[in-house]
């Protein structure tokens, strides 16, 4: 477990809805499912990473956060997580 997973977990209320933007290998999603909330999804730009997450049974879709976040209706999530992601945005 990465050190920041515990910190992120402490900020999220139990049984809340969360989206992990740029979820990569899905390890944070897996950690949060096991320790905090079952209702968490991921958005990832890498097709290979998405396939890897799906093979682990994680709810992840392929998309570019700068363009595809709009597909989610307002108030879909209680938390949106950008762990190691914000620096990749062109216009943060």
What is each PLM-predicted segment?
Residues 1-15:
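Conserved alpha-helix/loop element of class I SAM-dependent methyltransferases that forms part
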Residues 84-85:
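Short catalytic micro-motifs in class I SAM-dependent methyltransferases
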Residues 16-24:
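Conserved class I S-adenosyl-L-methionine
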Residues 81:
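A conserved beta-strand element that flanks and buttresses the S-adenosyl-L-methionine
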């Amino acid at each position: 477990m990465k050190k920041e997973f515990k910190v992120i977990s402490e900020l999220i209320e139990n049984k809340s809805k969360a989206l992990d933007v740029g979820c990569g290998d899905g390890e944070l999603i897996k950690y949060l499912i096991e320790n905090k909330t079952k209702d968490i999804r991921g958005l990832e730009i890498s097709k290979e990473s998405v396939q890897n997450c799906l093979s682990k049974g994680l709810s992840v879709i392929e998309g570019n956060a700068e363009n595809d976040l709009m597909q989610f209706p307002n108030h879909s999530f209680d938390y949106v997580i950008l762990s190691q992601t914000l620096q990749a945005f062109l216009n943060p």
